[in-house]
């Protein structure tokens, strides 16, 4: 905003108001194409890339706030539509031939989140099942002809190649010019040739491609062209030559270009359909499917290097350098090297890059992953390297109960396997001591403890996350292992002496050994469908995991085995969500009392009834279930200027139940809680729509104790 005020003398709101007044002064134009699909209010809808299905139907890709992208079949006579199948995130326009649809989807690699490819996909209309073509993960703009299948293949070095496959014959690979990008591919049945849409230093242009190279048909111009298709000796595409998006065609026989539509706000994605043209036309509710006769509005187009300046109001010139007039030559590069020495970027020394700090001590990893924000007086340093494969934080905090606290966390993603390092110092040393109930005195007796030292711990874990994106579904297999050491004081079980009545006779003199090792292994699998803009959670999905934890340095410590399962189901009304979860954990081996109870054991904190902590349970045949029903109650879609935007307020009603065997193995203990959560989805300080944070207020009534209240913040990182 400050740049706008400085250069034009007005604020951005005034600029937008002036722009709106200018647009209102322009002559109004009507849409030349007739509407096939009406758009609903308050559900922004986008139809893309319509294709003819005979004389009575249209196939199009549809997305709206309520549902993710899917192919729909539209009746051209009534406008009624039927879903064919859901898709992943489509990367380039689909094409149709002989009952088979071809398109490409973005798919991330199995190991690296930053590596995203474009997967070749197809679907037979007879069964409506999307399929992927193995080994074709860098494909764009697929086109099938009666005899061949062609697509554009890109390489990481910036080179594009047109690949043509005919049956079992060797593939033909047609090269494109160096330093050029391919933005479209089409095949014309009349001229029996392939055509490409090229972008290079001269602008955008259309050419015919064969084994000898690319032969220009139009001249390069700084005019955006898009969605190239061909049929009956004509090329169809979108162009902004007239000053806004309209459908154009190029007659290959007459060598003339025509604009074939007029529209109020723009027409897109023209597709020939037996003498007619299918399009999408824009208005405030989205993009709707329209059609018109192919020759109903043939407006000749005069070749030009620039589009008509239609929608841009007159502006005064800013006193800045026009980059189009700047020339950077080899001599300039040599002079720059003399002034600024080129240095190699060394990865290891640059893993740490402290970029900001905060005047409070907290764990940002726990805040993002678990929505747990534990604040203390102090400060936090945040680090992220330039390659974004290493994140770290260091904090110093203080509170009255624990004194000084120092924490360190590092995450590294650069090798596919994720490594986590954490270290802590400060607070009170943990004791794993013994206790027993003396029936004669009616009191509990506990092991004597020495004065505690400062607590410290260090841990290292490795996780291999494998992603398997299959369009509408995303599956993940995760294998992990971790080690942790702390200076916890563990009861010395070798010194136990048993007396009469099954009581420990020397409980005050058993003593402790210093140090607690924890080694864990885990595996998990999840499968979830894509979420729409208004979905609270995936409509369908599940997660299964199991973990095994043991102490390799102390055989008296019991091993812990745990299982966890979670499922997402649709609610009774659209965008309502049901979440069901269950877990089981128990201790194995280790030292056991004569009654069979294991006094030294680990506990999993997963799925403990809300209002309780891990201190309230025992890992002795522990079983728990949880049920949550979540629904939106209000969508304000407003807020305070550029400070906060409240997107949605939702309500969750939940209940938890757990049971486990008490110390004697013959008594079942049962705990439960019921309550709800009020969740506010908001965007702070002009964050993009995808970066939505949450604020949650929780209130639950546990079966033991008073009401339990909690508040948490979820960050979108």
PLM features: what roles do these ranges have?
Residues 423, 428, 434-436, 447-449, ...:
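C-terminal outer-membrane beta-barrel translocator/porin domains of Gram-negative envelope proteins
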Residues 521, 625, 676-680, 706-717:
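Outer-membrane beta-barrel "beta-signal"
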Residues 55-56, 99, 146-147, 190-192, ...:
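Short coil/turn segments that connect the beta-strands within blades of beta-propeller domains
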Residues 5-56, 60-63, 239, 296-416, ...:
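Outer-membrane beta-barrel initiation region
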Residues 1, 5-18, 44-45, 62-71, ...:
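A flexible loop/linker signature enriched in serine peptidases of the S9 family
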Residues 135-136, 260-263, 349-373, 377-400, ...:
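Transmembrane beta-strand segments that form the barrel wall of outer-membrane beta-barrel proteins
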Residues 364-366, 385, 396-400, 412-416, ...:
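Transmembrane beta-strands of outer-membrane beta-barrel pores
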Residues 75-79, 124-128, 165-169, 209-213, ...:
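Short loop/turn segments that connect beta-strands within beta-propeller blades
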């Amino acid at each position: 905003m400050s740049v706008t005020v400085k250069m034009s003398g007005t604020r951005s709101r005034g600029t937008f108001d002036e722009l709106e007044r200018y647009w209102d002064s322009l002559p109004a134009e009507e849409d030349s194409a007739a509407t096939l699909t009406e758009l609903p209010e308050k559900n922004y809808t986008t139809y893309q890339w319509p294709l003819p299905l005979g004389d009575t139907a249209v196939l199009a890709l549809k997305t709206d706030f309520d549902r993710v992208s899917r192919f729909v079949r539209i009746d051209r006579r009534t406008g009624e539509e039927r879903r064919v199948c859901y898709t992943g995130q489509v990367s380039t326009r689909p094409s149709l031939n002989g009952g088979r649809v071809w398109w490409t989807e973005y798919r991330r690699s199995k190991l690296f989140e930053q590596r995203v490819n474009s997967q070749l996909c197809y679907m037979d209309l007879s069964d409506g099942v999307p399929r992927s073509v193995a080994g074709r993960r860098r494909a764009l703009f697929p086109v099938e002809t009666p005899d061949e299948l062609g697509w554009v293949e890109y390489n990481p070095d910036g080179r594009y190649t047109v690949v043509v496959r005919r049956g079992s014959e060797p593939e033909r690979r047609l090269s494109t010019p160096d330093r050029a990008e391919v933005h479209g591919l089409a095949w014309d049945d009349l001229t029996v040739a392939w055509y490409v849409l090229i972008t290079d230093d001269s602008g955008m242009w259309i050419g015919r491609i064969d084994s000898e190279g690319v032969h220009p048909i139009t001249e390069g111009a700084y005019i955006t062209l898009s969605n190239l298709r061909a049929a009956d000796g004509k090329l169809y595409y979108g162009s902004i030559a007239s000053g806004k998006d309209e459908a154009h065609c190029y007659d290959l026989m007459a060598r003339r270009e025509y604009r074939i539509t007029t529209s109020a706000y723009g027409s897109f994605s023209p597709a020939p359909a037996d003498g007619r043209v299918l399009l999408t036309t824009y208005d405030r509710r989205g993009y709707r499917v329209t059609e018109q006769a192919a020759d109903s509005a043939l407006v000749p187009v005069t070749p030009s290097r620039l589009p008509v300046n239609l929608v841009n109001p007159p502006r005064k010139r800013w006193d800045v350098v026009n980059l189009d007039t700047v020339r950077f030559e080899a001599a300039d590069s040599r002079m720059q090297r003399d002034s600024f020495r080129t240095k190699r970027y060394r990865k290891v020394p640059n893993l740490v890059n402290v970029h900001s700090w905060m005047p409070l001590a907290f764990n940002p990893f726990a805040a993002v992953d678990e929505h747990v924000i534990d604040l203390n007086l102090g400060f936090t340093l945040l680090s992220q390297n330039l390659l974004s494969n290493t994140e770290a934080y260091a904090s110093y905090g203080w509170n009255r109960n624990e004194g000084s606290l120092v924490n360190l966390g590092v995450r590294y993603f650069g090798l596919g396997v994720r490594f986590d390092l954490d270290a802590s110092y400060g607070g009170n040393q943990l004791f794993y001591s013994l206790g027993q109930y003396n029936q004669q005195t009616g009191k509990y007796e506990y092991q004597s403890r020495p004065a505690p030292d400062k607590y410290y711990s260090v841990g290292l874990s490795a996780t291999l996350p494998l992603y398997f994106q299959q369009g509408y579904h995303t599956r993940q297999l995760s294998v992990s292992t971790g080690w942790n050491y702390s200076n916890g004081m563990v009861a010395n079980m070798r010194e136990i002496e048993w007396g009469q009545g099954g009581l420990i006779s020397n409980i005050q003199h058993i003593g402790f050994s210093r140090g607690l090792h924890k080694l864990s292994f885990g595996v998990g699998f999840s499968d979830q469908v894509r979420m729409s803009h208004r979905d609270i959670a995936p409509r369908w999905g599940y997660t299964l995991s199991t973990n095994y934890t043991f102490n390799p340095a102390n055989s008296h410590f019991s091993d812990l085995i745990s299982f966890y399962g979670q499922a997402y189901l649709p609610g009774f009304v659209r965008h309502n969500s049901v979440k069901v979860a269950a877990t089981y954990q128990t201790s194995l081996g280790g030292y056991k009392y004569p009654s069979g109870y294991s006094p030294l054991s680990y506990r999993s904190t997963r799925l403990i009834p809300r209002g309780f902590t891990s201190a309230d349970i025992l890992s002795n045949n522990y079983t728990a279930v949880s049920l949550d029903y979540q629904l939106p109650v209000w969508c304000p879609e407003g807020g305070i200027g550029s400070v906060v935007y409240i997107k949605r307020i939702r309500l969750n009603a939940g209940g938890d139940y757990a049971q486990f065997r008490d110390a004697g193995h013959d008594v079942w203990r049962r705990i439960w809680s019921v309550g709800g959560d009020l969740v506010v989805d908001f965007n702070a300080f002009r964050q993009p729509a995808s970066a939505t944070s949450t604020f949650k207020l929780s209130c639950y009534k546990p079966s033991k104790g008073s009401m339990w209240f909690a508040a948490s913040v979820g960050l979108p990182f």
